[in-house]
Amino acid sequence: EGAINIETNGVNGVAIGAGLGGDIRIEKGRYDLYINGENGVAIGSISTPVNLNLLQADIDITYEAANGVAIGSVSQHADIAIKNTSISLRGSGNRYVAVGTLDGDGCSVDISRAHVDMNLKGNSCIAMGSDHGIADIRMTDANSRLAVQGEACFALGSRDGTGMLSSNNADLNVVVRNSLNIDISAAEQDIRLVNGRYMFILNNENIERKVVERY
């Protein structure tokens, strides 16, 4: 339950995890991670699938690598669960994903009773999701603030449009500035919002989405 500080730099760097991936479980404690260099991972894997569980932790990440992922797998599928955890993530790079996979066949991201605050800039970046395949994102009793800025950047989903967002009783605030004119890369019928508070701003325009109220 102490504090861990890790800084990576170089061609390929992983702060917590390994190039070979596998199961990674982080429970309790504070983690301050600074990622720099050419290809970087804060928590996860470079070349294999990863199953990540972040539980009851306080995680602060500064991601400044040119390419890679902050939390997840660079080149394979990533299953990520974030529960009772606080994550603050600042990103600046060329091509990267904050939570998910960059070149894998998709990802699942399950956020429950957690707080996630992201401020991302880059040429091609994604807050939660993947460049390819299905990105299945679920939020329950979560508080998320996602600010994303860059030519080919967006907040949630999969770059090929096969993302899915299911949110229940969440407080979700999304602000995106890009040239894609997309904030969530998913079909609107695959965006399901139940209860909670939601705000979506794309290129200074407010986007209204249906929120189902169930009490």
Language-model features: locations:
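Surface-exposed loop/turn motifs in large extracellular/passenger domains
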Residues: 1-36, 44-122, 128-150, 157-215
